[in-house]
């Protein structure tokens, strides 16, 4: 082989080697474990991630856990990815695990969120426009605030408000339950035109299902307009660069999540089917998610994922 041929052969070998290394991942990357706190919006985003990862040739496991346990799982390497780091609601957990360097922030996946106490519009129109107004109507509310599952950061904020007698709420009680049970209580109260105060957030179909308003004055505990981050166990994106690239690309919109959640909560489709139907109707979003991403074996990611739809 002459010098020129050797040079060409060497260049080709190097190119193939580098391409292989670019997509090479540790064997442990074959299975991706997602944390799920049991919320409708994260069921949607986990469903999207699962469908895409499955198309790329990865196995996906979902662990349904409380938020504090998900953070601890990320720190211990028992959970790979969490798509539901709502900020600033989870600021304390973020500071403890992410800001300290124990868990990695990969990207912001959603912006413009709202997360605070809410009331039906008829209660708002009657004078309950802020946290400071709640205790004026304590009897109508039954001295109760309806929250979500125990351990949720928002519940802890409500407990802090009550313990500190903020807004005169020391005699109030937080009722903890699942998201679904909370919304059943809200629906029951709305049918009877009764006062009810509960934890509300966007995106969520509750904003369409109920004529509701968010209360002002709780910014100290719930912050202003927020965002949602994608987190991963420390070093995960470097260890599993192909998955890491996908995670950094995954961006959602409120309209997207609301549309899918509405299909699920109105029982028109399962979560997996609603995700698939929405992506079939909006395939252009997949193009951006898969930029710089391949299948696990280094193949055409776009073709593989669209074949799953």
Predicted regions and their residues:
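Immediate post-signal peptide segment of exported/extracytoplasmic ligand-binding proteins
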Residues: 23-33, 53-54, 136-142, 287-289, ...
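Ligand-binding cleft/hinge of the Venus flytrap
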Residues: 49-56, 138-172, 280
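Pocket-flanking alpha-helical
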Residues: 46, 63-101, 181-185, 204-211
